[in-house]
């Protein structure tokens, strides 16, 4: 197996379209590529754009990454996202506040909760889509 690592820039996280030429060139230079791993939700949310720009159709290039969002859900629906971790951003924001309140009021220790242990794939994305589109997952 050959692994090609592309160095991203902070601008690519805020404007994923700026990565189109980099990703397209890497895929053109590696025509046997089977999977593209994205490092964040912004990039995975742009999976369809990356694939189409490089000449790939739905389900022709596996794309995986992190986070759920309306854009990532759209990529699942259209066949351009295949696996992502569900970090449950609502819980990531809510649990620290709950933990601080319990520590202050009850004197308890901090809550240690893994919110990113779940995975969303092509078989189960529909079960989280409504909550992801609402910004809760």
What are these regions (language model features)?
Residues 1-137:
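A residue-level marker of the well-folded mature domains of exported/periplasmic proteins
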């Amino acid at each position: 197996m050959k692994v090609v690592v592309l160095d991203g820039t902070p601008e690519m996280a805020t404007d994923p379209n700026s990565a189109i030429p980099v990703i397209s060139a890497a895929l053109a230079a590696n025509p046997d590529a089977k999977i593209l791993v994205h490092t964040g939700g912004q990039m995975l949310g742009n999976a369809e754009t990356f694939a189409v720009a490089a000449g790939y159709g739905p389900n022709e290039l596996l794309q995986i990454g992190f986070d759920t969002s309306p854009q990532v859900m759209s990529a699942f629906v259209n066949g351009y996202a295949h696996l992502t971790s569900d970090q449950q951003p609502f819980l990531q924001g809510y649990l620290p506040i709950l933990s601080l309140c319990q520590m202050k009021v009850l004197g308890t220790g901090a809550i240690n909760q893994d919110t990113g242990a779940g995975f969303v794939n092509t078989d189960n994305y529909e079960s989280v889509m409504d909550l992801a589109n609402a910004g809760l997952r």
